[in-house]
């Protein structure tokens, strides 16, 4: 028993592995059951050989009870006749004889064997035309001779008792002899050459008429034999009843769980085909004992296998027996190379049998069919053998226990010894082996399911002592505790078996595994035993035929019943049509879309807020309906049904199907339960749907063989309850396709958010390493983004935005993402409409017709406008009438509802009459829904004369939602973007990507619409823009801002441009009016930066006009332009006279002279709002600064930032200015007096100002003056005692070691406030640099340090490296032009490895060279905080750069590496390509070289 548990545990482990999963999970789509598959599975051989034996034994009865229908060899299953027979023929597929479409599943390119795709008329193999005519008569004569031979060999085998009963339903004969002949002729004409097949039919009919008399004689003989056998059985029943009365009192417990095939035979009195291998009297006695559930002490062991029908039980073929020699010859023919395996059988869909030459069947198809059959048989044999082995292990153990119990009880039961002694003596040689009495019931029901019932009765008697092996121990008497322990162990093994088969179910088909697992627990099959030892083993999916769909199932129930003298094991199996465990040929296909549908089994259920979609518990609560089955007697029709995403299935139907039956069958294939929301449509030639009436028959609806249909929603309304996960998925699919193809036009922001959800559903959660630009190609990207949003943008730009939104999605499962998708899409104004392209009935010209879109919705119709985007909506209450015309349709509306794009009577031309009817049909259907809703609310009359199909749908939907005219994510900013991209596309101009990025950042920022974020800054500096590039921006702004919002519409106002930065674009001077045109268009701009745009005196006047027209400008930067003094004076004069809100003026490098300073003096005096004044790097002398000084005195309270650097002002006037600052109350906090000719004496006055109480300076720049060491030391002393300065620049002023020490001491104090320190080119020695490094180890305030252009030594570099390991505040570090070689840099980089606070480091103009590459790469791969590093002019060539990039890892945090200005003149194309490849590899880093 422990070995069984170990084997089952190993089997469970193997089933959980990926290898087993890949081997088992193959989906076979098969069309009909085959007797061949069962025989192959049970015997491990080919069913073709068995059919030859059956033909030989039973061909004489082939048409027994057939009546007139025997002329076509069609069995007549007439219940009034006592006999029936199913003749088995060797058949080949006819698919090879007819050309098929390349898209058809029957095409030879498909991997599925063609012969299994449809059930076709039977084909008998013949060698040539001459022999085909005589094969029928030969076959009949041969079968008769074989039958007689089998009769003579009846006694050759006494061990096996084989009953073959072919189950078939009663079918009334619908065709007379003539009809059957016509059916056979039609089959011949359809599938073969007409002349040849008619000749064969004539010969065939002639032969059939000649043997009719023979068959009648055989029928009479069989009838007599059946009556004799029935009489004998009735006598035996009487004897058995008497025996039962005697044995019933002595039996301790009697079980009622045995399936008695003979009892069924006696009750039904039906036909059967029995081939007996043992004497009939012994077999009947054995069955009588089974019937009364008791057996004598020493019964014989027997094995019987019977194939019977519920309404036939008469022995056919005179009780013929297959001899051992005959069986050996049959088994020998089952070898792999046997020629009998060259064909396969398909159930006939017509009555007749058609004979064709084998040579006419395509060899390619036959080879493919044979190869697939062998592979399937090997796979099935390996799987089934393991299951049977485990089943037998448990059965043998239980039988041994029962044998011991029965042996102990036999001593008390002596009355039955006499009755069974003879039988026991006859079979004493078989006592050591277990004989099986099985009856295999094969039954073809209306669901076309084959039910196989195997009753295994094992009767074990204690062997005589002389025959007991020496090594066998004496049976031990088990105590009740031991019996209970063994029972518990058996139950544990049974549960493990259930887990094994449940795992097999899930591996075979995940769609049915859940339902199968639930139903397996409830029992089923033929056994009704209540014993605890009963176990149910689902060999395949167990399907409840009463309430669920007739999916392929194979059910086995093993019941073990222990009595005083008998052990009976009953196994009932239900063989399905499409059982994957059986050797049935099928098409190995790719996984369909339904295999990947997420049914949303999550702990936290989600409920859609709009479509009332909900889950119950862990799953959707649904019930499956039963689908109609294919009628094998009717012509088969293949139907190609696709979903809206172009995934499809091919199903087989018959002519008796209605459209509703087709929907149910297709839904069963998909696992769909709530079918009431979906309909079938046929796509017409004009691209629109022709909806099929579900109550019509398929031929009336126009469904033909290989018709292509679409399965989708017709009436798109909000369902009251949608509880089927597959229905949710189909809703999602149709909406998603409508969004992508533009049927539901929506805003770009809405579209991208829906696309991000779709991407999440398709590819899962965001992965920053996987989901990057380039993940999707253009074709795949078009399946997510509507085509009208591509414009001239690259795929990388679109994917970058898509992945950004994808990263914001927080969903627990894909089903939740689908529900969010439906909720968001429900806000689209055109949600749920069916769109039709029509044309205006009134043409504007004889050639051009105006295209319009007419959309039918649940509450009215929408008609697209002529002059602009959008729709005019008319509710059904507004519409007076609508009708179909010869050219299309006509719609009449009241005069009050007329819009500029519509008229009182609107005529539209359609592409076809069917399209017009389709539109009217949808409108009428939606009106019925509205009338029903009004009637329910009590405000309308009941609906009269409503279509039956619509009446069934009325209670399923909610009332129409309130229609909105606008998308909630439609915004002014998006409209500006679309207008700009449209202009660029029309004029074939590349859009400015930086502008698009800035717009998308606002649109896609999380919570942007909820928080009402606005687009306020247009920052386009340093892009080498031209005037024409800006003209599109100006035009788009004009169109956007001038858009008038109609009544009932809404738009998010998120476009409010306040700042325009066009600096450092010198090419704009070619057309200076264009940048100014933007300002004139958008009157909200108050901050204007036009620095270095090439503005000359010609462009001054438009700027002056803007200043005069828009007096609210607060910031004006026009520095570094080619405006001379006259132009500056004109601008300043305009500001002085018209602007009263100016705060910032920038006139650096504008050639401003002393005369211009007079205007600045007046401007400062009159305008009290100026806070920032920059007049640096001009031609101002002492006289000009004197005017400015006077103006500052009058505006001392408002001016905060003064930059007069780069002007030749002598030291005396500056000392006077500093003294005034020290003695006056001013607001100046930023003072830049760099490069103004200051001398060392200025240092003392500056020290006094810095230590005074009136000093509020926060930023002081005295760079590039001639202060000397003494003047600089005085400035440092003033800074030491100052508590306000946070930014200090002493660049290009010599600092002594003592001054440096004093500065470091003040910065080491806890009260230090300086955060930015610039000591560039200050002549610092090695000791001073070491001192600064030691200071930085203690300082907690400095974030920016510039030590560039100071010569570093090894010791100072090592000190800097040590400092970097300890410092935790420094963020920007400048070490440019510091004579740092490879060794010095290595010391600094070693300290930088473990520093996580520095974000930027500048190592430009240092001779690092090739030797420093490894240390650089090592630092970059190790550091976790560095974002920017500059290595300009560092003696690196192309090979060095390539080597550096190769050593870099892809997951480093750095963002920018600047390698420009290195010697790359002699770089080869190979190295350049290699560098580009590395840059692609390091795509997350902006590498500049």
From Swiss-Prot:
Biological processes, Gene Ontology terms: cell-cell adhesion
LRR repeats: 1017-1040, 1053-1075, 1087-1110, 1111-1133, 1167-1191, 1196-1219, 1254-1278, 1282-1306, 1339-1362, 1367-1391, 1395-1418, 1428-1450, 1451-1474
Record-annotated FERM domain positions: 637-934
Comp. bias (Low complexity): 131-153, 181-195, 277-287, 421-435, 556-569
Record Pfam families: FERM_M (PF00373), FERM_N (PF09379)
Residue spans of biased composition, Basic residues class: 163-172
Record GO cellular component, one term: cytoskeleton
Regions of compositional bias (Polar residues) in chain numbering: 59-79, 103-118, 303-312, 545-555
Keyword entries, A-Z: Coiled coil, Leucine-rich repeat, Repeat
Taxonomy, superkingdom: Eukaryota
Coiled coil spans: 202-289, 356-383
Disordered: annotated span: 59-86, 103-197, 252-271, 277-312, 396-435, 459-479, 508-569
Protein name, as recorded: FERM domain-containing protein C
